[in-house]
């Protein structure tokens, strides 16, 4: 029963619309600006770097908190992986927004850092490298999503964690399908200041 409650908590925390809450604090509805997405890149577009930083931090904590709580309560790798997946699913398909949410990148980063800190931090650093080099946050997200399962596998992480990166990564890639098409067409927004893009 505790395991089920932990997974549900992961989903509920993942569903908290950080971007919308931060946007409101800055006097803007991020759903009506840019791509309309509630994630970090579009919050930057709508309200600037400070709001974007708060959104990224909040979205990452949505992934970190339930995993660390589950671990503190003695949950094993399978439950921890399920909690992590629930948080990402909650962010992508939140109950509070009629299942129309973000793309799971920051929340996924938070869960990865909580599950395996060295690997998760490495993937977070890779995201920044690709994002800054290309100016495409969506490309960075997709690169990290593809690389993560191999990083978790080769670093000897438990099988449930590896499977989580595959299934959770599939959700993130699905949420980025329009970005992938835009990249191929050469119409994807670049990020930077209030005119940036990627999600």
UniProtKB/Swiss-Prot annotation:
GO CC field: plasma membrane
Q: How does it sit in the membrane?
A: Multi-pass membrane protein
- Domain of life (superkingdom): Bacteria
Transmembrane residues, as ranges? Answer: 2-22, 77-97, 113-133, 139-159
Keyword Membrane found: yes
InterPro entries associated with the record: G3P_acylTferase_PlsY
EC number, UniProt record: 2.3.1.275
Coarsely, its chief localization is membrane
Task: Please state where this protein is localized.
Answer: Cell membrane
What is this protein for, i.e. what is its function? Catalyzes the transfer of an acyl group from acyl-phosphate (acyl-PO(4)) to glycerol-3-phosphate (G3P) to form lysophosphatidic acid (LPA). This enzyme utilizes acyl-phosphate as fatty acyl donor, but not acyl-CoA or acyl-ACP.
Give the record's family classification.
Belongs to the PlsY family.
- Name of the protein in its database record: Glycerol-3-phosphate acyltransferase
Question: What organism is this sequence from?
Answer: Rubrobacter xylanophilus (strain DSM 9941 / JCM 11954 / NBRC 16129 / PRD-1)
Write the gene name: plsY
């Amino acid at each position: 029963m505790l395991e089920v409650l932990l997974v549900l908590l992961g989903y509920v925390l993942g569903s908290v619309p950080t971007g919308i809450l931060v946007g409101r604090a800055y006097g803007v509805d991020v759903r009506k600006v840019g791509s309309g997405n509630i994630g970090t890149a579009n919050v930057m577009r709508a309200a600037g770097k400070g709001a974007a930083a708060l959104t990224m931090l909040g979205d990452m904590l949505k992934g970190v908190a339930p995993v660390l709580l589950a671990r503190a309560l003695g949950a094993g790798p399978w439950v921890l992986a399920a909690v992590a997946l629930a948080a990402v699913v909650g962010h992508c398909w939140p109950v509070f927004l009629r299942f129309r949410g973000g793309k799971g990148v920051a929340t996924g980063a938070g869960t990865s850092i909580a599950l395996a800190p060295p690997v998760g931090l490495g993937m977070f650093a890779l995201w920044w490298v690709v994002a800054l080099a290309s100016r495409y946050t969506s490309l960075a997200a997709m690169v990290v999503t593809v690389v993560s399962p191999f990083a978790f596998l080769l670093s000897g992480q438990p099988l449930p964690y590896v499977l989580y990166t595959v299934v959770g990564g599939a959700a993130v890639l699905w949420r980025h399908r329009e970005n992938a098409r835009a990249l191929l067409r050469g119409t994807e927004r670049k990020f930077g200041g209030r005119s940036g893009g990627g999600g």
